[in-house]
Amino acid sequence: MQEIGRTARSVAPMAKRILLFGSQARGDAREDSDWDVLVLLDKDRIRLEDIDNVSYPLRELGWEIGEDINTVLYTVDDWAKNSFTPFHKNVEAEAIVL
């Protein structure tokens, strides 16, 4: 988990928050469970290069360590606008800050 956090912070220095969510955060992961990472970027919108620069290095780290790392990117504003959704509520309830 620490390596995922270090990598995420290094490839997304503009991130306001980097959160682990899902089964790994809840502590009920199985051996084959993936790692779900939410990265909140302080930008006006998510661009294709953000996906390339943030999501791909984390996916590559997963390949190196034998884990499946899924990255979800939101702008800070878009995340706040979605605060009513079940996804947002679940992430905020279970998240671990990386």
Give the location of each predicted region.
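Histidine-centered divalent-metal-coordination microenvironment in nucleic-acid enzymes
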Residues: D34
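Catalytic core of pol beta-like nucleotidyltransferases
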Residues: M1-L19, A25-E31, L41-L98
